[in-house]
Design a protein with these regions (language model features):
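Catalytic cores of TIM-barrel enzymes
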Residues: 1-135
Length: 135
């Protein structure tokens, strides 16, 4: 049985392995929405905790080690210390999304919902620069 590292290296070298390497959540392309991450944790019987948002533009949740192990994931993400909106991802706080889910987001992040139900986020916490993230 190959290790995750072996599987990925063999795939990148176009060699066979015991199975195709699996990636859920290591990049913005393979990420999983925070609602789905919470549902997967419940499905696999993992302890409840607010999902850490790793991509605030797409609201992608962190696939942490216990969930990755449960799903047989081979790849792990290597994130930076700032998100796409220039928020510090080292300092997080709990916030409730407009759909009622508790998540961990950068402390500068302020999800604002307007009267039509659209949700906005602000670059670097600057209320003059807004981005629509949910309509």
């Amino acid at each position: 049985m190959s290790t995750s590292r072996d599987r990925v290296r063999q795939a990148l070298s176009h060699q066979g392995s015991d199975r195709i390497p699996v990636d859920f959540g290591a990049t913005a392309v393979t990420g999983i929405h925070c609602r789905v991450v919470e549902a997967l944790r419940k499905h696999y019987g993992l302890s409840y905790k607010p999902v850490k948002i790793v991509d605030t533009f797409q609201m992608l949740g962190e696939v942490d080690r216990d969930l990755a192990d449960a799903m047989g994931v081979d790849c792990i993400g290597v994130g930076g210390t700032r998100d796409i909106f220039d928020h510090d991802t080292e300092c997080m706080h709990e916030q409730v999304t407009p759909w009622g889910q508790k998540v961990l987001v950068p402390i500068q992040l302020d999800l604002t919902q307007d009267k039509e139900g659209d949700v906005y986020v602000y670059a670097g916490g600057d209320k003059n620069i807004s981005f629509l993230i949910l309509s």
